[in-house]
From Swiss-Prot:
Enzyme class: transferase
Protein name: DNA-directed RNA polymerase subunit omega
GO cellular component term of the entry, any: DNA-directed RNA polymerase complex
Gene name as annotated: rpoZ
Origin superkingdom: Bacteria
Length: 65
């Protein structure tokens, strides 16, 4: 299990809720068959999604707001 610091994640988005939603949506995409943007995917989709967000490989889609 990965335990990232909120300080590092707050550089991406200050809202914990928004980060949680972003990671969970990306994890769902990975479960549904989307390709990972990492060179080596982790076993768990949530861990992979979180690492993608931390490495800024995926970002929040604000077009629906």
């Amino acid at each position: 299990m990965i335990n990232p610091s909120f300080k590092k994640l707050s550089e991406i988005n200050n809202s914990r809720y928004a980060l949680c939603v972003m990671v969970s949506k990306r994890a769902r995409m990975l479960i549904d068959g989307k390709e990972t943007k990492l060179k080596k995917a982790k076993a768990q989709p949530v861990t992979t999604a979180l690492e993608e967000v931390m490495e800024k490989k995926v970002w929040e889609d604000k077009s629906n707001e």
